[in-house]
Design a protein with these regions (language model features):
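Conserved, structured core segments of small domains
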Residues: 1-186
Length: 186
């Protein structure tokens, strides 16, 4: 089963996050085979780290919580909170399959929270989708929202990916492809 784990930074933790980047990557290396998407989020300026999102396959909710709470930056106090949700990979692929490449400052994480459990919308239709899926209850039975990784011309354009659908709230975060870069990735 797949999960979205979004660690959100506490204010002023950027230096700590940068100091722990190698420990973070080493920890994530242990989950590389099951990783669907990963990467840091930033404020509107694109300069200040605000979090770290991971979408990956794990055996059960308990394993997802262990993944979230054993992460080195979490253990060191860099994060203010963590969101752990079951995830349905509606695109059926990983971020590395995205034809638009991994470079660019025009990538975003968009999370739409549903108005009432069970009113699930359709998957947005766009060649700019890097990742997309339903956020679900722990038992996987109830739709709670939608998470999208998208290439867009700006924050407003990213928000439009979920426009016209029924959401109580939509949050948009600048996002970059994460993980170690190998020679063939640039």
């Amino acid at each position: 089963m797949d999960f979205l784990v979004y660690h959100r930074d506490r204010p002023g933790s950027g230096d700590l996050r940068r100091a722990l980047v190698e420990e973070h990557w080493s920890y994530m290396d242990g989950f590389a085979e099951t990783m669907i998407a990963r990467g840091p989020t930033f404020d509107e300026s694109g300069e200040v780290l605000t979090g770290s999102v991971h979408v990956l396959g794990l055996p059960d909710p308990a394993a997802a919580w262990r993944f979230a709470f054993e992460e080195p930056s979490y253990q060191a106090g860099a994060y203010r909170d963590v969101l752990v949700r079951r995830f349905r990979n509606d695109l059926g692929r990983t971020m590395w399959d995205f034809a638009g490449g991994r470079d660019g400052d025009d990538r975003y994480l968009v999370i739409g929270w549903g108005p009432a459990p069970g009113t699930e919308p359709v998957v947005p239709d766009s060649d700019d989708l890097i990742g997309c899926g339903a956020l679900l209850s722990d038992d996987g039975e109830t739709w709670l929202g939608t998470a999208v990784l998208v290439r867009a011309a700006g924050l407003d354009a990213a928000r439009e990916v979920l426009a016209g659908r029924r959401y109580d709230a939509v949050e948009v975060h600048r996002w970059h492809f994460g993980g170690r870069r190998t020679e063939d990735q640039g």
